[in-house]
A protein has these predicted regions:
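Feature marks short, surface-exposed loop/turn motifs that line or immediately flank catalytic pockets
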Residues: 14, 56-58, 129, 212-214, ...
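Metallo-beta-lactamase
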Residues: 75-108, 120, 125-184, 233-258
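Core dinuclear metal-dependent hydrolase active-site scaffold
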Residues: 7, 37-42, 48, 158-200
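Active-site metal-binding loops of divalent metal-dependent hydrolases
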Residues: 52-55, 105, 127, 187-189, ...
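Cap/insert and terminal regions of metallo-dependent hydrolase folds
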Residues: 71-85, 201-275
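Conserved nucleotide-sugar donor-interacting segment of glycosyltransferase catalytic cores
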Residues: 110-120
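Conserved beta-strand hairpin/beta-sheet module of binuclear metal-dependent hydrolase folds
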Residues: 3, 12-85, 195-208
């Protein structure tokens, strides 16, 4: 039985200037970015989330997210868009979510972890270490309150994986080892990963924040100036980020019929994956 994948927006953000961030729209019009979350129905392992978007605790008390994030991202706080609310709207219960796979632990990706306290949280080992022991520069991106409930962490180390379209692939879930893979894509953070998922239409790759705009994977790469600046402001290693972005572009162009690649914040890609 193939996996069934739901594509959710669990946190719309409206930073200033659509023209500079989305590449279209007015100079004074707010931009639109999304938090693209996957909810996966599995035959035997319950539900699996890939990322969580903005969670109910932070929606109820936005000050938890910090003044800088609020001023820059200008999120729309809607309890109905949280992953836990959308899980319920689909007829499930929060405890049905047995696994959460995070691309990384930035506050807009891990905010919903407390809404699923029984879930096992899968993360790439270098990302876990970076978040638990942040340096002065990375403290702003990680929010310890989002894991104050002591999640059931499952850390996955590099090595011992297999090749997946030229990338390293780690198997986080033994029962779904043929259908879900962690794909290290370092650069945005020290332990950033994509998550490859196979459904009845083939492979898809949730690339997290390895890139931000669909035009970056085009034959003639392009990107709005404001979003390019933001991408550089939040990167950890530019050389690795650009190298992995270029590898993703090659993957998307060379295997367009085999792999659907999308990132975490592009509303155009979210709409395309929803069909």
């Amino acid at each position: 039985m193939p996996l069934r994948v739901h594509h959710l927006d669990c946190g719309t953000m409206c930073p200033a200037c659509a023209r500079l961030m989305n590449g279209r729209g007015g100079w004074l019009e707010p931009a639109k970015l999304v938090c693209h979350v996957l909810l996966i129905e599995t035959p035997r392992d319950g539900l699996v989330l890939v990322d969580t978007g903005l969670g109910s605790l932070d929606v109820a008390d936005p000050s938890r997210l910090g003044a800088a994030f609020l001023a820059l991202s200008r999120p729309q706080f809607d309890a109905g868009r949280t992953a836990v609310a959308q899980v319920r709207a689909l007829g499930f219960q929060p405890e049905d979510v047995r696994h959460i796979i995070v691309t990384h632990l930035d506050l807009d990706h891990a905010s919903g972890l407390p809404d699923f306290p029984l879930a096992q949280v899968h993360v790439f080992e270098p990302e876990f270490q970076a978040a638990m022991k942040p340096n002065w520069r990375s403290k702003a991106r990680y929010l310890p309150a989002q894991w104050a409930h002591s999640p059931r962490w499952s850390c996955h180390a590099a090595g011992g994986g297999e090749r997946w379209f030229g990338f390293e692939g780690l198997r986080p879930l033994p029962g779904l080892q043929d259908d879900i893979l962690l794909v290290p894509l370092i650069g945005h953070t020290l332990g950033h990963c994509g998550v490859a998922v196979r459904d009845d239409a083939g492979w898809m790759l949730h690339a997290g924040d390895a890139y931000f705009y669909h035009g970056q994977l085009a034959e003639q790469p392009h990107m709005p100036a404001g979003l390019r600046l933001f991408e550089r402001l939040v990167e950890t290693d530019r050389r690795l980020r650009e190298r992995n972005r270029d590898r993703l572009r090659e993957l998307a162009l060379s295997h367009a019929g085999e792999v659907r690649v999308f990132c975490a914040h592009d509303p155009v890609e979210l709409a395309g994956m929803r069909g």
